[in-house]
Amino acid sequence: MTSAVTGVLRELATLFGAWGAEDARTAETITITPADLAEDDAFNRLALRIHAVQRMSNPMLRRFWDGASGAEPASWREIPPIPVMAFRDVPIVCGTPEAVFRTSGTSGGRGGRGEHHVPSLDLYRATARGNYRRHLLRGVRRIRMVSLIPDPVVVTDSSLARMAGFIADEPEVAETVWAFDPVTGVDVDSVRDAARGTDPVLLLTTAFSLVHLLDALGSGRLPLPPGSRIMETGGFKGRVAEVDRGALQARVDRTLAVGTSCIVNEYGMTELLSQAYDGVAGGGPADAGATGTDENGAHGGEPRPGSPVPRCHRFPPWVRTRALDPATLSPLPPGQPGLLCHFDLANA
């Protein structure tokens, strides 16, 4: 790994790790704060710097960008995006990866599983930590974590499992119960034991594991202790019948006594190092500090008068998301459906 790559990875880990800290400038080399990245000028300068390092360090990326454009970009908007399918065909990394995370895909190259070669786990932890602390652990002093996401010691190539491991390391987490096995599935008895305690529970789960838990509990109720909250992520991936999100949350409220305001949806992809959340556990929209979600400004649209405020996913300020025309990759106006293009500075 070149010194340029090592340097930029270290700087990004310091910068992103400072998000939400009292003193965001934690190193002399950091001349901007995470909040500055909400402004296009600061975001653009850092994006172009990362692009230059990647172009210099990865011949495959250099050939791709030369073939797609050829011109030196003057703005991050001019950098040709990497298609998701590329993660199934070639390793996209600058230097030697510390970890390789794999998707759960079932078709395509290399067995259909995309691979994200991550050069720095410190960067991944720094990227994830401020975000999940803001949205899942705000106001928490002590909590028990019950994970229906696999233990990262058991499933080593899952970015989601690794993030669950990061959360388990937080000082507020008094105990962690790994209640999902890739072979046997959800450990309902472990969830029952957690419900009998007095500490509030942070339940981390995929959507299909949550449905399996509710199905196993049947018509019975298993109220979690007051202050409990749930992070739900992912779709159903064909493992269970699709369930309307509103109906699922109502069922959770009836069975686990966790209201909608304490159920937070996390949006992530193996191909991205950053995550988006649609609310703060305990009430409130996704953190206002996460302003980089939609470069076009269409955060789900404006609510009609008298209607509830829509819950919209927000990334941290080092991510921009654009809706592009699938045929031309030209940006679309606000409100138009298109191909989502995430520009994540953590994908260095």
Protein language model annotation of sequence segments:
Residues 114-157, 161-174:
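Long, hydrophobic, well-ordered secondary-structure blocks that form the structural core
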Residues 41, 53-102, 110-117, 130-139:
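Active-site diphosphate/adenylate-binding microenvironment
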Residues 107:
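The conserved Walker
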Residues 58, 125, 129, 207-210:
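Short, hydrophobic/amphipathic alpha-helical packing segments
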Residues 5-20, 24-30, 34-39, 81-83:
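Anionic, Ser/Thr-rich low-complexity intrinsically disordered regions
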Residues 2-19, 41-53, 142-144, 151, ...:
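Active-site glycine/GP-rich loop and adjacent strand/helix microenvironment
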